[in-house]
């Protein structure tokens, strides 16, 4: 199965009714997203060996919240949705959609917000980004979207991605239309922008018990059935790993068919779990999975592979 976004005027009345039964997509709810993430990162930093880095990530998430309200985005995506729907492509495809200079405006605003909070190497990094040319910034963005991580240092990548993510999340929040599940391929990528997930979550509330993958760029969540590999869609050789016990709120789902794993967060076991924060705070589980020979099928926006990884 794949997910395609259909313009409102192309949906029949029956589709408009059934589209809400099991929502294929959950668009980002930006009002509380960054504040909730920052709070969760700070909470997880307590008694965590990665505490300093989690607090650093919390500063970026808080800055995203501030910049979101200071620099709103106005854009009519109706034509883009129609074109993408006709082509069967993600409407905000990172490999196709031209980048507006708005994202660089967001980056400069993030840097201005973060500067008073930074010191040492981190301050040097954002000052270096502040001095970079427009083309240099575009080249780094293109490299990240192409997974050419050797071209962007791992200390610059989180800041570049934070601005790109904010821009794409703003666009995703403006999408007019409904999502429809169809047969297709590449379900492991975000149907809105084509980026990778950061983790998956089994939710509570109106989507009780359903698993959604969380996009590491546009913050959209898309439905993928449980007990099926989110990377290759096979189901015969899945294993579940945790550092605590079978009732752990964070597990890794590994697949022996493709040799990858993705974390699953369970809201029913810990309602506070957050897709980015809890993934970042559980790197010990990633180390265990690497020891077992599995490759991660996702990327955390605060932790990019370095050169040679």
From Swiss-Prot:
Gene Ontology CC, one term: cytosol
Gene3D superfamilies with a match to the protein in the record: FdhE-like domain
In terms of InterPro entries, this protein maps to: FdhE-like_sf, FdhE_C, FdhE_central, FdhE_N, Formate_DH_accessory
Report the superkingdom from the record.
Bacteria
Task: Please tell me whether the keyword ATP-binding is annotated for this protein.
Answer: no
Q: Where in the cell is it found?
A: Cytoplasm
GO biological process assignments: protein maturation
Q: Which UniProt keywords apply?
A: Cytoplasm
Which GO molecular function annotations are given, in alphabetical order? ferric iron binding
What Pfam families does the entry give?
FdhE_C (PF24860), FdhE_central (PF24859), FdhE_N (PF04216)
**NCBIfam families from the xrefs?**
FdhE, PRK03564.1
Q: Which family does it belong to?
A: Belongs to the FdhE family.
Q: What does this protein do?
A: Necessary for formate dehydrogenase activity.
The cross-references to HAMAP family, in alphabetical order and at most eight, read: FdeH (MF_00611)
Protein name, UniProt field: Protein FdhE homolog
- Organism name: Shigella flexneri
Q: Which gene encodes it?
A: fdhE
């Amino acid at each position: 199965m794949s997910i395609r976004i259909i313009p409102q005027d192309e949906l029949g009345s029956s589709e408009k009714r059934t589209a809400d039964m099991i929502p294929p997509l959950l668009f980002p709810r930006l009002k509380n997203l960054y504040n909730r993430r920052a709070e969760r990162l700070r909470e997880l930093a307590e008694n965590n060996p990665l505490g300093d880095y989690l607090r650093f990530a919390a500063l970026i998430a808080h800055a995203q919240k501030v910049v979101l309200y200071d620099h709103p985005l106005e854009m009519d995506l109706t034509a883009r949705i129609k074109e993408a729907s006709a082509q069967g492509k993600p409407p905000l495809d990172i490999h196709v959609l031209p980048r507006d200079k708005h994202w660089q405006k967001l980056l400069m605003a993030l840097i201005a917000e973060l500067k008073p909070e930074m010191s040492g190497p981190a301050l040097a990094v954002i000052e270096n980004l502040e001095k970079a040319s427009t083309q240099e910034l575009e080249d780094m963005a293109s490299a990240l979207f192409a997974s050419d991580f050797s071209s962007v240092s791992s200390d610059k990548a989180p800041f570049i991605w934070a601005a790109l993510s904010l821009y794409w999340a703003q666009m995703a929040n403006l999408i007019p239309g409904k999502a429809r599940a169809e047969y297709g391929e590449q379900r492991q990528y975000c149907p809105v922008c084509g980026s990778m997930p950061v983790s998956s979550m089994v939710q509570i509330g109106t989507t009780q018990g359903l698993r959604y993958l969380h996009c590491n760029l546009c913050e959209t969540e898309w439905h993928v059935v449980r007990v099926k590999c989110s990377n290759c869609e096979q189901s015969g050789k899945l294993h579940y790993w945790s550092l605590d016990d079978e009732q752990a709120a964070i597990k890794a789902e590994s697949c022996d068919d493709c040799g990858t794993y993705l974390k699953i967060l369970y809201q029913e076991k810990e309602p506070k779990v957050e897709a980015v924060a809890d993934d970042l705070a559980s790197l010990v589980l990633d180390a265990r999975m690497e020891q077992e020979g599995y490759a991660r099928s996702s990327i955390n926006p605060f932790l990019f592979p370095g050169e040679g990884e």
